[in-house]
Amino acid sequence: FVNQHLCGPHLVEALYLVCGERGFFYAPKTGVVDQCCTSICSLYQLQNYCN
């Protein structure tokens, strides 16, 4: 996994991959789009959105 821009379905797919059965919370106010789509995010940053 390389730090990258993840938007739309690619972001959701990456969250499923990282979080697995734990699932994740997706709320626009959490900043995941700002962090991973507008900017570049890492695997570690994605894990912050797992349940």
UniProtKB/Swiss-Prot annotation:
GO biological process: cellular response to oxygen-containing compound; glucose homeostasis; glucose metabolic process; positive regulation of protein secretion
Keyword Ubl conjugation: no
GO cellular component: extracellular space
Matches recorded under SMART domains: IlGF
UniProt signal peptide: none
GO molecular function: hormone activity; insulin receptor binding
SUPFAM superfamilies reported for this sequence: Insulin-like
Record key words, sorted: Carbohydrate metabolism, Disulfide bond, Glucose metabolism, Hormone, Secreted
Subcellular location: Secreted
Cysteines engaged in disulfide bonds, as pairs: C7-C37, C19-C50, C36-C41
Function: Insulin decreases blood glucose concentration. It increases cell permeability to monosaccharides, amino acids and fatty acids. It accelerates glycolysis, the pentose phosphate cycle, and glycogen synthesis in liver.
Family stated for the protein in its record: Belongs to the insulin family.
Quaternary assembly: Heterodimer of a B chain and an A chain linked by two disulfide bonds.
Protein name (Swiss-Prot/TrEMBL): Insulin
Organism per entry: Saimiri sciureus (Common squirrel monkey)
Taxonomic placement: Eukaryota, Metazoa, Chordata, Craniata, Vertebrata
Encoding gene, per UniProt annotation: INS
